[in-house]
Design a protein with these regions (language model features):
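ABC-type nucleotide-binding domain
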Residues: 1-245
Length: 245
């Protein structure tokens, strides 16, 4: 829950990046966040694991103000995958198990299947023992994103945040990832920031952000009727072919 949240990178008295944000997200929901560049989409989700603290108001997880959690406990419950997450040099196994170093081989494969990574990993001659070079430059952007999603899933988070982290994945694979989320981790709250409408179209609720304020909340169907910003983005992508297949 976000309760009357204001946020400024400069603290009290600074220019507000987020203004009076009120938001209720039910446990297990899939929530999409969309908005133009500079609408503070990433800033909003970074307040959940306390990468930053609110300037005013509060953010709650499970009914408790995030500032009242032990930071390690809070961050164990929240997994965030960025658009440009990093892989380090080592095997694919080692990279995934960074999410939980005690995970079994079976668990690693399970999360890779969820993230639609098992298929391409299994095709590598060395499979999960394939060595990743520093920065992950020997796998494609879309493969890297899927491995990072798998790593985040291994933590078994209560809240999974994807910050434009399927941007390099084709829309079919993106849809398969979301289907797997719905079927296999229904109790995990999933927050998806996206540029592509197709990535969030089937979300339980979509939040439209504009200049740090909530400009609309609803399902895709509702927002198409009531929200000009969402409708414009939707029509430009769907009719303009801006959504790659």
């Amino acid at each position: 829950d976000f309760n009357h949240v204001d946020f400024s990178y400069a603290g009290e008295g600074g220019n507000l990046s987020l203004k009076d944000v009120n938001l209720h997200i039910k446990s297990g929901q899939t929530v999409g966040i969309i908005g133009g560049t500079g609408s503070a989409k990433s800033t909003l989700v970074q307040l959940i694991p306390r990468l930053y603290d609110v300037t005013k108001g509060n953010v709650q997880v499970g009914g408790v103000d995030v500032r009242n959690y032990n930071l390690e406990v809070l961050r164990d419950q929240v997994s965030m995958v960025l658009q440009k997450n990093v892989l380090f040099s080592g095997s694919i196994y080692d990279n995934i198990r960074w999410g939980d170093e005690h995970a079994s081989e079976e668990e690693v494969r399970r999360v890779c299947k969820l993230a639609q990574a098992d298929g391409f990993v299994s095709e590598f001659p060395d499979g999960y023992d394939t060595m990743i070079v520093q920065g992950g430059n020997n796998v494609s952007g879309g493969q890297k994103q899927r491995l990072c999603i798998a790593r985040a899933l291994l933590k078994k988070p209560k809240i999974l945040i994807l910050d434009d982290s399927t941007s390099a994945v084709d829309t079919r694979t993106d849809a398969l990832i979301r289907k797997a989320f719905r079927e296999e981790i229904p109790n995990t709250t999933k927050i998806i920031i996206a540029q592509r409408v197709s990535s969030i179209e089937d979300a339980d609720q979509i939040i439209v952000l504009d200049d740090g304020k909530i400009a609309g909340v609803g399902t895709s169907e509702q927002l198409l009727k009531t929200n000009d910003i969402y409708r414009e983005v939707y029509e430009s992508q769907v009719k303009g072919g801006g959504d790659d297949e």
